[in-house]
């Protein structure tokens, strides 16, 4: 069982020199505007820390959070950072993540050695969008051998049971979701505990 011992906001950065020192492993959370990033981060960290932008598509800040998790089963305590990136694809003409994030954000992803895991949030109701396909290609193209990329489906509870099952069968594994009611789902779907364990496992595969 994973216990969240601490979770707090560190800083917001708009330039590389404003970012905190790379002293611990980091996971990046990215996704389209309105995909549910803030909801997922708050669920993951067990605390209402992330706020939705009042002007989606306008802010170009990277928000850093620090958290400490205790894995009781393995007697392991880990402190790491979560980096919340601005939602992409807000402008209808935006089809290219790298171009949209040119400058600070793309440089951050390219050079920050402490980033070990990219979590790409995808709206379970809107699969195979061009901007999500492009984002996946762009992120995977810059992955180092010590980094991993995972997809996680948000708003899973908005699907009916047949749609949930179809997504479960066809989605890449590990199958990861976020929902407002984990306990109401069938036992074949991952619990919040399993989501946390999976992300921690990938984060620690190549620790800083």
UniProtKB/Swiss-Prot annotation:
Its domain of life reads Bacteria
Q: Which residues cross the membrane?
A: none
Instruction: Indicate whether Cytoplasm appears among the record's keywords.
Output: no
The molecular function GO annotations come to: GTP binding; metal ion binding
Q: Which GO terms describe its biological process?
A: division septum assembly
Output the CDD domains linked to this UniProt entry. YihA_EngB
Keyword Cell division on entry:
yes
Q: What function does the entry list?
A: Necessary for normal cell division and for the maintenance of normal septation.
Q: What is this protein's name?
A: Probable GTP-binding protein EngB
The species this protein was found in: Helicobacter pylori (strain HPAG1)
- List the lineage, top down: Bacteria, Pseudomonadati, Campylobacterota, Epsilonproteobacteria, Campylobacterales
């Amino acid at each position: 069982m994973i216990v969240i011992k601490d979770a707090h906001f560190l800083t917001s950065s708009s330039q590389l020199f404003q970012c905190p020192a790379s002293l611990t492993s980091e996971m990046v959370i990215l996704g389209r505007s309105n995909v549910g990033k803030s909801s997922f981060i708050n669920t993951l960290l067990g605390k209402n820390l992330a706020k939705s932008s009042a002007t989606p598509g306008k802010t170009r800040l990277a928000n850093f959070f620090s958290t400490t998790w205790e894995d009781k089963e393995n007697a392991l305590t880990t402190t790491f950072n979560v980096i919340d990136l601005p939602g992409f694809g807000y402008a209808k003409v935006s089809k290219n993540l790298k171009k949209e994030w040119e400058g600070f954000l793309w440089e951050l992803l390219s050079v920050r050695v402490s980033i070990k895991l990219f979590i790409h949030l995808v709206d379970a109701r809107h699969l195979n969008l061009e901007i999500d396909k492009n984002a996946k290609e762009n992120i995977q193209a810059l992955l180092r051998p010590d980094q991993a990329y995972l997809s996680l489906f948000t708003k899973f509870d908005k699907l009916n049971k047949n749609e949930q099952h179809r997504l479960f069968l066809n989605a890449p594994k590990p199958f990861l979701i976020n929902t407002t009611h984990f306990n109401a789902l069938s036992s074949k779907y991952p619990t919040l505990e399993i989501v946390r364990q999976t992300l921690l496992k990938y984060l620690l595969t190549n620790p800083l």
